[in-house]
């Protein structure tokens, strides 16, 4: 029988269900939760089982190379996130092997694979971490129904988050809290605050008879159809539980930094040593337990005399994650504008050329372009950098739909998370949660206050590496002689600005004001016809304004 090592004084209760199956083994299905520490599904699967099957299913639609995509990767994910996932799986496999087990990797549609496994193996339990994402909600119903029909006990604990979103919604009268402060008030203290977390094992049950199922090792990128040189500048962040725990240990070793962490004061231009923990991709894949992270932070707060508090503290960032998970779980069509009761209905522009220029880092604004190039190369950038490019695309300059920006982030970010990504895009486009649309990030001055020399821009946009610092954020203002000396002619080597920020932001504010007025007038019940009428009005107003500008006498 395996032994458990625990790290806190009280017990974690599993609430087992009586099994009807005659098998003596368990199947643990890994999806997220790619870790050994604080993994209730793994703990329960291993208890009282003669053998255990740890399974991960590679979905070809998510993992295999798609040459038609705008960046290296599959049809669903960029290669950086796929690489991070493979590293996480290899690390998990290594940890399981040290405990007398291994990861059994399958390829195919996950629901079909799980049913085949249950048909082939005599198991009494199917264990997997509960997932609130719509994709897994639909998939899990099918798998649970089949398992239950054959007498297999299903254990699916909530362990990806601190709170069970369904419980928060129930406590709030059947609706999710729509503000951060109201969420904190309803949520209270998580149950893990005083729970013991199983952090390690001395051994795990061996794998039983595999039968006739085709099982493989964790594949390499090359085996999935990717080339070594497909992306020269890989993300510097390595996947896996081992790396997550190392990064956490290093981050929290500086208690003063943890105690004084204040989100708005981070430096978005810091890239050699990011001004934050970069724990988000490890939380996204469950390489790090959010509950263990929470306990570590609480222990530090107890040891220091003074510390920052939510929403700006490090703990506050963890609770923002909980807020978006809860809101997303309780809001139908959370990932869309249409049919989403908490989302403002806004007649966004549709301009594929502008979207592509923003996506590819070719807007003509070096601060914006450097951020997007970092995203393309690393799959990550600082949260304030994300704010800048999201604002620029939507309500700040281009007035393009937040869903289109969301899709780019969803593909490229290594920490792309369905609830958080959609929530942040609604927030930053002033479609929900945040409504002060007159507050806009300048694509020129915002980055300059953190990095006046433009080191960040020079790193990610080497075409501008020799541009004098007084022109690095506005290279189009440099005299031609300066551009020539810097080997960067604007309009030839680097694009001209696609819009003029001052006039574009003014126009965006006007459009947002009109859209807000319509939403207020219709009490949030804006339909397609209302949006079409407003779009026509805005286009007419824009045309008239353009005529007036062209009729003004030009200064000689």
Curated annotation (Swiss-Prot):
Protein name (database record): (6-4)DNA photolyase
Residues engaged in binding DNA: 320, 427
Keyword annotations: DNA damage, DNA repair, DNA-binding, FAD, Flavoprotein, Lyase, Nucleotide-binding
Site (described: Electron transfer via tryptophanyl radical): 348, 402, 425
Record's compositionally biased regions (Basic and acidic residues): 539-548
Residues that hold phosphate according to the record: 262
InterPro entries attached to this UniProt entry: Crypto/Photolyase_FAD-like_sf, Crypto/Photolyase_N_sf, Cryptochr/Photolyase_FAD-bd, Cryptochrome/DNA_photolyase_1, DNA_photolyase_N, Rossmann-like_a/b/a_fold
DNA-binding in keyword set: yes
Enzyme Commission number(s) of this protein: 4.1.99.13
UniProt-annotated stretches for the region Interaction with DNA: 382-387
Inducers of expression: Not induced by white or UV-B light.
Essential cofactor(s): FAD
Entry keyword Lipid metabolism: no
Enzyme class: lyase
Cofactor binding description: Binds 1 FAD per subunit.
Catalytic activity annotation: (6-4) photoproduct (in DNA) = 2 pyrimidine residues (in DNA)
Impact when changing residue 439 to H/A: No effect on DNA repair activity
Signal sequence, start to end: none
Family: Belongs to the DNA photolyase class-1 family.
Disordered: annotated span: 534-556
GO MF annotation, one: nucleotide binding
Tissue expression pattern: Expressed in siliques, flowers and leaves. Not detected in roots.
GO biological process, one term: response to UV
Binding site for FAD: 263, 276-280, 317-321, 380-383, 386, 415-417, 421
One Pfam family it belongs to: FAD_binding_7
Naturally occurring in which organism (per UniProt): Arabidopsis thaliana
């Amino acid at each position: 029988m395996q032994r458990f090592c625990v790290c806190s004084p009280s017990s974690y209760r599993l609430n087992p269900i009586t099994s009807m199956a005659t098998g003596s083994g368990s199947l643990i299905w890994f999806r997220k939760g790619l870790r050994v520490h604080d993994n209730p599904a793994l703990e329960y699967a291993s208890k009282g089982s003669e053998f255990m099957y740890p399974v991960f299913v590679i979905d070809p639609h998510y993992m295999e190379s798609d040459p038609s995509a705008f960046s290296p990767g599959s049809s669903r994910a960029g290669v950086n996130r796929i690489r991070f996932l493979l590293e996480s799986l290899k690390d998990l496999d290594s940890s399981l092997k040290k405990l007398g087990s291994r990861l059994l990797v399958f390829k195919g549609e996950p629901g079909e694979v799980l049913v085949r496994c249950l048909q082939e193996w005599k198991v009494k339990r199917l264990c997997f971490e509960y997932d609130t994402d719509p994709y897994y909600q639909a998939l899990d119903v099918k798998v649970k129904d089949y398992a239950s029909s054959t007498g297999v006990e299903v254990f699916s604990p909530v362990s990806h988050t601190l709170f069970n979103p369904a419980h928060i919604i129930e406590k709030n009268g059947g609706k999710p809290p729509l503000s951060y402060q109201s969420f904190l008030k309803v949520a209270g203290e998580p149950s893990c605050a005083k729970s013991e977390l199983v952090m390690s094992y001395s051994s795990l049950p061996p794998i039983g008879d595999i039968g006739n199922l085709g099982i493989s090792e964790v594949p390499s990128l090359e085996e999935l159809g990717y080339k070594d040189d497909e992306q020269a500048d890989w993300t510097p962040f390595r996947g896996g539980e081992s790396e997550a725990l190392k990064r956490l240990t290093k981050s929290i070793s500086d208690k003063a930094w943890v105690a004084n962490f204040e989100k708005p004061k981070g430096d978005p231009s810091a890239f050699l040593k990011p001004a934050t923990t970069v724990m988000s991709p490890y939380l996204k894949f469950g390489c790090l337990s959010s509950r263990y992270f929470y306990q570590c932070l609480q222990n530090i707060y107890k040891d220091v005399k003074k510390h920052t508090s939510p929403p700006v503290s490090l703990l506050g960032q963890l609770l923002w994650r909980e807020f978006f998970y809860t809101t997303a779980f309780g809001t139908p069509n959370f990932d869309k504008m249409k049919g989403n009761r908490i989302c403002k209905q806004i007649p966004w522009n549709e301009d594929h050329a502008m979207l592509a220029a923003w996506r590819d880092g070719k807007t003509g604004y070096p601060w914006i372009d450097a951020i997007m190039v970092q995203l393309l190369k690393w799959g990550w950038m600082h949260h304030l950098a994300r704010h800048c490019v999201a604002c620029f695309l939507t309500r700040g300059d281009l007035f393009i739909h937040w869903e289109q920006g969301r899709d780019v982030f969803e593909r490229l970010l290594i920490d792309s998370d369905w609830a958080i990504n959609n929530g942040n895009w609604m927030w930053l486009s002033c479609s929900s949660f945040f409504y002060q649309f007159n507050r806009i990030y300048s694509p020129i001055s915002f980055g300059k206050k953190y990095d006046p020399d433009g080191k960040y821009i020079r790193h990610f946009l080497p075409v501008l590496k020799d541009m004098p610092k007084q022109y690095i954020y506005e290279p189009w203002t440099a005299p031609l002689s300066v551009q020539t000396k810097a080997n960067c002619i604007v309009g030839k080597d680097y694009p001209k600005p696609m819009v003029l920020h001052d006039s574009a932001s003014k126009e965006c504010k006007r459009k947002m004001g009109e859209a807000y007025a319509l939403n207020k007038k219709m009490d949030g019940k804006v339909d397609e016809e209302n949006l079409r009428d407003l779009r026509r009005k805005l286009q007419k107003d824009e045309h008239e304004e353009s005529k007036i500008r062209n009729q003004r006498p030009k200064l000689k």
